[in-house]
Amino acid sequence: MKKGTVLNSDISSMISRLGHTDTLVVCDAGLPIPKSTTRIDMALTQGVPSFMQVLGVVTNEMQVEAAIIAEEIKQHNPQLHETLLTHLEQLQKHQGNTIEIRYTTHEQFKQQTAESQAVIRSGECSPYANIILCAGVTF
């Protein structure tokens, strides 16, 4: 049995195949996922698992260099936005690097998901609970 934190074989495999600057999306239950992008559906029911639960597990395994977030989260989901920023700050300290945070419109965000290696769908049902993670290197 795998000893690492990620037990889901699809997520573990996807993270292990990421190269520098490749992207991976963690999203809420409502984000449209392009047919051309690999979909890893973790949603069981509304809120399970939460966006932050999925993000926490993914970022424990993935080296993150940058993050892209929809600008609209600031107004429409400020509590999650603050939680997300705190998580990224803690991740920076743990990884020993600076994580660049970029904001874009939700429409542009949806277009960028088509370029990602995969989209991991959580059961989150709050607005704009989505992030594009850009892979870094550990050396």
Swiss-Prot record:
Enzyme class: isomerase
Sequence positions that bind substrate: D28, H106, Y128, A129, N130
Reaction it catalyzes: beta-D-ribopyranose = beta-D-ribofuranose
Biological process, per Gene Ontology: D-ribose catabolic process
InterPro entries linked: D-ribose_pyranase (IPR023064), RbsD-like_sf (IPR023750), RbsD_FucU (IPR007721)
Main location: cytoplasm
Pfam family, one: RbsD_FucU
SUPFAM superfamilies: RbsD-like (SSF102546)
Family: Belongs to the RbsD / FucU family. RbsD subfamily.
UniProt-listed Enzyme Commission number(s): 5.4.99.62
Source domain of life: Bacteria
Pathway stated in the Swiss-Prot or TrEMBL entry: Carbohydrate metabolism; D-ribose degradation; D-ribose 5-phosphate from beta-D-ribopyranose: step 1/2
Keyword Transmembrane: no
Subcellular location: Cytoplasm
Oligomeric and partner information: Homodecamer.
Function: Catalyzes the interconversion of beta-pyran and beta-furan forms of D-ribose.
Entry GO terms, CC: cytosol
Protein name in the entry: D-ribose pyranase
Entry keyword set: Carbohydrate metabolism, Cytoplasm, Isomerase
GO molecular function: D-ribose pyranase activity; intramolecular lyase activity; monosaccharide binding
Gene3D superfamilies given in the database record: RbsD-like domain
Enzyme active site: H20
